C-alpha cells in the first residue's frame, strides 16, 4: 500500500501539467498504471479474474 501522503500529493493538481502522474485508484501504486481503467497491473488482473471489470476477458490464441 502506498503512503497516504504520496497518494494525496498525486491527487492535487500540479502547478505545471507535466509534473502530474498516474496512480492506481485502488492501491495507490505509481507504476504500471493502465490509464483506461485507472488501475495498476496487479489490481487490474485481480479484478478481471473476479469478473468485476465488464467487457474484460482472458485472451486465448
UniProtKB/Swiss-Prot annotation:
Gene Ontology biological process terms, A to Z: translation
GO cellular component: cytoplasm; small ribosomal subunit
Domain of life: Bacteria
Record-linked PROSITE patterns: RIBOSOMAL_S14 (PS00527)
Binding site for Zn(2+): 24, 27, 40, 43
Family classification: Belongs to the universal ribosomal protein uS14 family. Zinc-binding uS14 subfamily.
HAMAP family in the record: Ribosomal_uS14_2_B
Protein name: Small ribosomal subunit protein uS14
Amino acid at each position: 500500500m502506498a503512503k497516504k501522503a504520496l497518494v494525496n500529493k498525486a491527487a492535487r493538481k500540479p502547478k505545471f501539467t507535466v509534473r502530474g502522474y498516474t496512480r492506481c485508484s485502488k492501491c495507490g501504486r505509481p507504476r504500471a498504471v493502465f490509464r483506461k481503467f485507472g488501475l495498476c497491473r496487479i489490481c487490474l488482473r485481480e479484478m478481471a479474474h473476479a469478473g468485476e471489470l465488464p467487457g474484460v476477458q482472458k485472451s486465448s490464441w
